[in-house]
């Protein structure tokens, strides 16, 4: 199977997000990479489901709460930017202060 660099990146994000979901389900607090991966994957899947950029930017701040993340991690993430594919093309989504 031949994958483009972009496809490899998507798979890496998905794998990290899957690990984060499992740890979250066990009640563990997420670290920085897990937090970013989980939010990024949710944005990518939302675009796949047909949501708009505005909807995803709004929903991106409600995916995780401070109580689910290790201390200090929310302050490390001022915004998350991800380029996702929509039916009408690729767009950049920016979520400011994703963990409030």
From Swiss-Prot:
<dbReference type="GO" id="GO:0043419">
    <property type="term" value="P:urea catabolic process"/>
</dbReference>
<dbReference type="InterPro" id="IPR050069">
    <property type="entry name" value="Urease_subunit"/>
</dbReference>
<dbReference type="Pfam" id="PF00547">
    <property type="entry name" value="Urease_gamma"/>
</dbReference>
<protein>
    <recommendedName>
        <fullName>Urease subunit gamma</fullName>
        <ecNumber>3.5.1.5</ecNumber>
    </recommendedName>
</protein>
<dbReference type="GO" id="GO:0005737">
    <property type="term" value="C:cytoplasm"/>
</dbReference>
<keyword id="KW-0378">Hydrolase</keyword>
<dbReference type="InterPro" id="IPR002026">
    <property type="entry name" value="Urease_gamma/gamma-beta_su"/>
</dbReference>
<keyword id="KW-0963">Cytoplasm</keyword>
<dbReference type="GO" id="GO:0009039">
    <property type="term" value="F:urease activity"/>
</dbReference>
<comment type="pathway">
    <text>Nitrogen metabolism; urea degradation; CO(2) and NH(3) from urea (urease route): step 1/1.</text>
</comment>
<dbReference type="InterPro" id="IPR036463">
    <property type="entry name" value="Urease_gamma_sf"/>
</dbReference>
<dbReference type="GO" id="GO:0016151">
    <property type="term" value="F:nickel cation binding"/>
</dbReference>
<comment type="similarity">
    <text>Belongs to the urease gamma subunit family.</text>
</comment>
<dbReference type="InterPro" id="IPR012010">
    <property type="entry name" value="Urease_gamma"/>
</dbReference>
<comment type="subunit">
    <text>Heterotrimer of UreA (gamma), UreB (beta) and UreC (alpha) subunits. Three heterotrimers associate to form the active enzyme.</text>
</comment>
